[in-house]
Regions:
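Internal alpha-helical transmembrane segments of multi-pass membrane proteins, especially GPCRs
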Residues: 17, 23-26, 47
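Alpha-helical hydrophobic helix detector
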Residues: 25-41
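A generic beta-sheet turn/junction motif
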Residues: 71, 82-84, 142
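Right-handed beta-helix
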Residues: 131-142
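Short, small/polar residue-rich loop motifs at catalytic or cofactor-binding pockets
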Residues: 145-147
Length: 167
């Protein structure tokens, strides 16, 4: 004989009807603990990705300006503007004509050393006009645990990215 659901006693029907409130609360509590542990590391990872993306954007913009100065056979100046919205790095030719603009993420903070080198000028002979190396240090204003990166330009216009610096 087959037993149908309707022929079962009411106490058995209630027992097999689903999750209890306690089981649901325990599941939610465990989930909250897991999310609480994972959330800080995710925010640090996102900050590191923003720093990496900004450093790569700066390096690519500088490399493009270096190539443009050789192709055009004139100086090309790169200026980082933190006062504009969004922050940007702008390339201009010798006649102050804007060649290209790269936006920088708003949560990224960039400091330049030496501070007087707000503009880096590339010459057609593949050197920069500055007598000193120029270093852009990239940090993230939304996090204090990120790994800062530096974009370095030496006198002969070699551009490199390193994991260094302090925020």
């Amino acid at each position: 004989m087959r037993a149908s659901k309707n022929s079962l006693s009411p106490t058995i029907q209630m027992r097999s009807s689903g999750f209890t409130l306690i089981e649901l609360m325990v599941t939610i509590a465990v989930l909250a603990i897991i999310v609480g542990i994972a959330a800080p590391s995710i925010s640090t990872q996102l900050a590191n990705q923003r720093v990496k993306a900004t450093a790569n954007t700066l390096a690519n913009a500088l490399k493009e300006a270096k190539v443009e100065s050789v192709i055009r056979r004139q100086e090309v100046a790169m200026t980082y503007r933190s006062s504009s919205t969004p922050n940007a790095i702008i390339a201009q030719d010798a006649n102050d004509v804007v060649l290209f603009t790269y936006p920088i993420h708003q949560k990224s903070s960039v400091t330049i050393n030496p501070s007087t080198a707000g503009t880096v000028t590339f010459r057609p002979n593949k050197i920069i006009t500055s007598d000193k190396d120029v270093v852009y240090t990239v940090c993230d204003s939304g996090s204090s645990n990120e790994t800062p990166k530096q974009v370095r330009i030496n006198k002969v216009a070699n551009i490199s990215i390193i994991n260094s610096g302090s925020c």
